[in-house]
A protein has these predicted regions:
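Short coil-to-beta strand junction motifs in C2/discoidin
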Residues: 2-6
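Non-catalytic C-terminal accessory domains or segments of carbohydrate-active enzymes
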Residues: 11-129
Length: 129
């Protein structure tokens, strides 16, 4: 599928963050019935080092893009992401940790146009910088 990771985390925009699926070679993506008037949009996120997944901006069809996110790092204990945007813009960044916990953090972009967030495993929110 073009990802270096063989395990992906899938979510639907309709199902929100409470309906995450793990997808791999042995577990196919489960889809519900949809129609042209009510399509099911699926967002896939690769599993990163340490078992984390950057789910990105939860209310966007393209939740992670190189235009927004400039770096992502992860280990078993924590994950971080650097991103950019307009001065004063509030960006919501969501991660799923190795244990399946989901964290959501709102960070305000500063005058430099850059910001970052770090989340530790088990935390419901991260720390902005």
């Amino acid at each position: 599928m073009g990802y270096s990771s063989s395990t992906l985390v899938a979510r639907t925009l309709r199902g929100g963050l409470g309906a995450l699926q793990t997808v791999d070679d042995n577990t196919p993506l489960a889809l519900s019935t949809s129609s042209p008037d009510d399509p099911e949009v699926v967002v896939l996120s690769p599993t990163l080092d340490g078992g984390w997944a950057l789910l990105g901006e939860p209310n966007k069809w393209v939740s992670v893009s190189p235009q927004r996110f400039t770096a992502v790092q992860s280990s078993a204990a924590s994950a971080s992401a650097s991103f950019r945007g307009a001065d004063g813009e509030v960006v919501t960044v969501v991660f799923r940790d190795p244990h399946g916990h989901v964290s959501s953090t709102q960070c305000k972009i500063g005058t430099s146009g850059n910001a970052s967030v770090k989340v530790t495993a088990g935390a419901s929110t991260g720390v902005c910088a």
